[in-house]
């Protein structure tokens, strides 16, 4: 696992939107914006178990993530990693609510099934342009 620098940690600790790239069955990339959180220096993303990214990650755990600072869009980080755990049920909702509070200051709305993918970081890079 790659340790994250303070500038990368700051990007993931803030309410910044990340973009997650996974691989479809045919090898084509699939990229979506996500809310993201930190769990013991690993990354956590939430999704529906029926989503395309969940199907992709269930088949191939490799993932690439980019994130930019919403207040300073020239600051960015790029991550490569792999899913090491899938969390469901009440343990997932605890993580989901922590992530939701970061973005909207309230628990995540209930009513739809959600899971959390825990991502171990293999490579991390940060840069501020300009």
Predicted stretch roles:
Residues 2-3, 75-130:
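Charged, gly/pro-rich active-site loop segments
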Residues 24, 67-70, 106-113:
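A short, aromatic/hydrophobic, helix- or strand-capping loop or linear motif
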Residues 4-8, 53, 95:
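Hydrophobic alpha-helical segments typical of transmembrane helices
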Residues 51-53, 72:
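Short, surface-exposed beta-strand-loop junctions and turns on beta-sheet-rich folds
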